[in-house]
Amino acid sequence: MKKGGERYVNWGREALDLYEKNLNKVGKIEYRGEFPYTLLPTFHSTATAQITVTIDEEGNFLHGEQVPANDKFTIIPVTEKSGSRTSGKEAHPLCDNLRYLAGDYPLYVADDGSCFEIYMEQLKKWYESEFCHDKVRAIYYYLQKKSLMHDLIEQKVLKQNEDGTLAEKETIQGIDQSKAFVRFIVRSLSNPLTETVDECWRDKTLWEKYQQYQRSM
């Protein structure tokens, strides 16, 4: 048992050493053929996004668009439970499916709105913590308005039936539009481009704030 334990400790130490030696590669997306991959920041995973929503720092909606298939690879913060979510309702901390992010989702799709409540309760805790980030604040302000579905329909990102409900047969990248995964761009005028980037999935300062937040728990 002792030898097995030592092997496990040595393996863990070697893995940590290897990770630390490659910190400069964290978050850099590379390709094997047409398949993207990256060394992930801790407490993060990847998702394939179907919709990009652009807002400003005050949480005002600017633009929505469908994500091109060759740009869907997205780094997102996760919790231990949301990272292994299958059929449960565990919300991701920031980017997620429409039913989690859209407070007006039940106006267009048969849904009880519980996923939105779970998501917002979790996001509020990050927003109120000392590890909040400007992008987290902007997204929280925007989603409180409960207008995401309306905004995306106005931009013709989502399509409706004649009765105003969301069209069931419409897809984005082959995914039912009602199940689309959303990521955010927060347009910043207060920070030079050399310090940060507007895309949440590429912002190292946002990754670091989430890592600090998770470690504080």
Ranges and model annotations:
Residues 1-217:
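Conserved phosphate-interacting/catalytic interface
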